[in-house]
C-alpha cells in the first residue's frame, strides 16, 4: 500500500447504485496502492473494511490528493464543505440528473479511476461567495457558497421587503420572494431557474437575480467580482424573518432590520477536470439543447470553392489599357 496516496470518497449513500459503485471504486483504488478514506456518516452503509474513517469536518480531506464524489450536484456541493479549506480537488462522477458540476458519468467509472491512478487530470478553480449577516452592526452569521446564496421569505403568505445596494450605493427596493446571488458556477442552478443568465465559468462576476419581485426595475444584475452586494431586510408592522440559504444546504435565520453582504470568497473550490470540451458543448450535452441544422464556420469554409488566380488578383480597373 502506497501510504503517500489517499483518496477521499464522498458518496450519496441513499442510492444503492452509488454504494455498489463506491465499493468497486475502493477496490480498484486499493489494487492500485491508493488508500481510501470515507466520512463517518457514510461508513456503515459503505462497509469498506480497509477504509480510513474520518469526521465530516473542514480537514476531512487533509492529506488527500483528490475527493472523488459519487452522486449528483448536491453531493458535490456537500463534498465542497470538506474539501475547500484544504484546497483538495473534487472529481465528480454523476449519478444524478443534470450533474453540471460532475466531470464523468457512471458508465465511465473505470476510466475515471484510471485518470486518478495515473494523475491525468487538470485542476481549475471556481470562485465562491462569502456572506456576512449583521443586525445593528453586530455580526450574527457568516457563511459561504460555491453556487449561490439566496435570501428568501420564511412564510408563504408574506412578501420580503428588501433594498439592494451595490458597492455602497442603493440600487432599488422591492417586495417579493427574495433574491439569489450567484457565482458563474451557480448560474446554471437556482439563478438560472429564476431567469438569470448563464455565465461561462472563466468569466469572473457576481450575479444577483430577483425572486418573483413586484417592481418595475427588478432585473438580473451582473457585477464585478470586486463588487459587494448588500441586501437590507426592511422592518415594517407585519415583517417576518427571512431565511438565508447557501448552496441550498446551510441556512441562517435573518431577522427584519438585518443586512446581508455578499462578496467574492477568499477560498475558491478546486475541481478536477480531464475533459477539455468547451463549456458550450457541456451546456448542449447537459441540457440536451437542439443544435441540428448547425453547419459551423469550418464546415462552410471547407465547402467554399478555391478562388481562381484572376479572382484572387483582380485587374486594376483604373489602370490605362
Q: Predicted regions span which residues?
A:
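Proline-centered loop/turn at the N-terminus of a beta-strand
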Residues: 35, 87-91, 207
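Catalytic core of DAGKc-family lipid kinases
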Residues: 98-177
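ATP/NTP phosphate-donor binding region
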Residues: 1-66, 107-122, 133-143
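Gly/Ser/Thr-rich active-site loops/lids in small-molecule metabolic enzymes
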Residues: 159, 169-217
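Gly/Ser-rich helix-loop-strand patches that form or flank binding pockets
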Residues: 83-96, 100
Amino acid at each position: 500500500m502506497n501510504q503517500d496516496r489517499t483518496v477521499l470518497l464522498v458518496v450519496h449513500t441513499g442510492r444503492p447504485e452509488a454504494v455498489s459503485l463506491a465499493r468497486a471504486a475502493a477496490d480498484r483504488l486499493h489494487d492500485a496502492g491508493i488508500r481510501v478514506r470515507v466520512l463517518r456518516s457514510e461508513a456503515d452503509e459503505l462497509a469498506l473494511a480497509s477504509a480510513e474513517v474520518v469526521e465530516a469536518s473542514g480537514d476531512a480531506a487533509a492529506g488527500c490528493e483528490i475527493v472523488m464524489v459519487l452522486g449528483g450536484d448536491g453531493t458535490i456541493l456537500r463534498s465542497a464543505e470538506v474539501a475547500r479549506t484544504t484546497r483538495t480537488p473534487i472529481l465528480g462522477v454523476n449519478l444524478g440528473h443534470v450533474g453540471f458540476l460532475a466531470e464523468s458519468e457512471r458508465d465511465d467509472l473505470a476510466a475515471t479511476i484510471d485518470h486518478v491512478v495515473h494523475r491525468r487530470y487538470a485542476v481549475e478553480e471556481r470562485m465562491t461567495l462569502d456572506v456576512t449577516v449583521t443586525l445593528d452592526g453586530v455580526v450574527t452569521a457568516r457563511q459561504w457558497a460555491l453556487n449561490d446564496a439566496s435570501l428568501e421569505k420564511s412564510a408563504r403568505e408574506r412578501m420580503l421587503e428588501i433594498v439592494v445596494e451595490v458597492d455602497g450605493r442603493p440600487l432599488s427596493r422591492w417586495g417579493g420572494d427574495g433574491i439569489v446571488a450567484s457565482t458563474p458556477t451557480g448560474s446554471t442552478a437556482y439563478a438560472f431557474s429564476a431567469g438569470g443568465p448563464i455565465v461561462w465559468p472563466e468569466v469572473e462576476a457576481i450575479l444577483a437575480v430577483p425572486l418573483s419581485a413586484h417592481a418595475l426595475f427588478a432585473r438580473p444584475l451582473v457585477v464585478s467580482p470586486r463588487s459587494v452586494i448588500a441586501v437590507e431586510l426592511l422592518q415594517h408592522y407585519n415583517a417576518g424573518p427571512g431565511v438565508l440559504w447557501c448552496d441550498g444546504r446551510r441556512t441562517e435565520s435573518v431577522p427584519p432590520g438585518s443586512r446581508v453582504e455578499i462578496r467574492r470568497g477568499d477560498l475558491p473550490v478546486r475541481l478536477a477536470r480531464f475533459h477539455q470540451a468547451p463549456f458550450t458543448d457541456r451546456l448542449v450535452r447537459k441540457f440536451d439543447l437542439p443544435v441540428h441544422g448547425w453547419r459551423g464556420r469550418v464546415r462552410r469554409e471547407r465547402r467554399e470553392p478555391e478562388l481562381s488566380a484572376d479572382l484572387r488578383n483582380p485587374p486594376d480597373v483604373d489602370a490605362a489599357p
